[in-house]
A protein has these predicted regions:
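C-terminal domain-tail junction helix/linker
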Residues: 3-6, 45, 180-219
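Extended, low-complexity cationic-aromatic segments
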Residues: 13-100, 212
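Mobile genetic element proteins and their domesticated derivatives, centered on retroelements
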Residues: 33-35, 74, 80, 99, ...
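Short, basic/hydrophobic alpha-helical segments
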Residues: 93-114
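Acidic/histidine-rich, metal-coordinating catalytic segments
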Residues: 110-124
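Active-site proximal helix-loop segment of RNase H-like, two-metal nucleases, encompassing DDE(D)
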Residues: 159-178, 191-195
């Protein structure tokens, strides 16, 4: 959803994100988008009937709910890399440990990671202090350049788009448990990363100033 009228805060946050996406790739200063979504685990109550030359695979309409999981999507759009972490919950502590993995495992040699994310209340520096001692929390805070999409501007977060691809290519069927979910996502992730599939993003600040002119204050 885009605001219907002039909104200086929206365009300021939007341009900050767009300028980040316009940067040339630099491994010392990677751009990383993060988003998350819940997932429902569903078990079959009857064994599906395999496909035949005359019929596709047939699945009974009944299923059994088997809990939920949370998916953290991390997507580096300039290099075509993504990583999905499956957790039981989506607390501040879960979020903090995902950031620690980014900083220390996936991008240990980066000087600063430009982190683009939505304005969820857990997506904050404070979450690191809930999970780690102060010195460690501060170290991790300083590894990131914290950027937020504007309110009603989650479409600017490329991790949201990548979650959409994941949902359509991998999560479009019943997945019975967390272990199966992790395995299915890992296979999808491996294929996407092997092909270095990047974001097909062409929206720039100059584009925004023309197409979204109504959002800019009249001066």
């Amino acid at each position: 959803m885009i605001p219907p009228e002039q909104d200086a805060e929206f365009v300021a946050c939007m341009e900050e994100v767009l300028e980040t996406y316009a940067q040339a790739y630099d491994p010392k200063y990677p751009v990383l988008c993060m988003d998350e979504q819940p997932g429902q685990l569903l078990k079959e109550t009857r064994v599906p009937i395999a496909a035949t030359p005359k019929h596709g695979r047939r699945v009974d309409y009944e299923y059994e709910r088997n809990g939920t999981a949370n998916l953290f999507m991390m997507f580096a759009p300039l290099e075509g890399w993504r990583r999905v972490i499956v957790t039981d919950r989506h607390t501040a502590v879960d979020y903090a440990h995902v950031l620690k993995g980014l900083a220390d495992i996936h991008f240990p040699d980066a000087r600063t990671i430009a982190l683009v994310q939505d304005n969820l209340n857990t997506h904050a520096k404070a979450s690191l202090y809930e999970a780690f001692p102060a010195a460690e929390a501060r170290r991790l805070v300083e590894r990131f350049e914290w950027q937020y999409t504007p309110k009603h501007g989650s479409w600017l977060n490329l991790a949201e788009s990548e979650l959409g691809v994941l949902s359509s290519q991998c999560l479009d069927r019943r997945i019975p448990d967390k272990e199966t979910l992790i395995g299915e996502i890992a296979a999808w992730e491996h294929d996407r990363n092997a092909n270095h599939t990047k974001a097909n993003w062409h929206f720039t600040t100059p584009n925004a100033r023309i197409k979204l002119e109504h959002l800019y204050p009249s001066i």
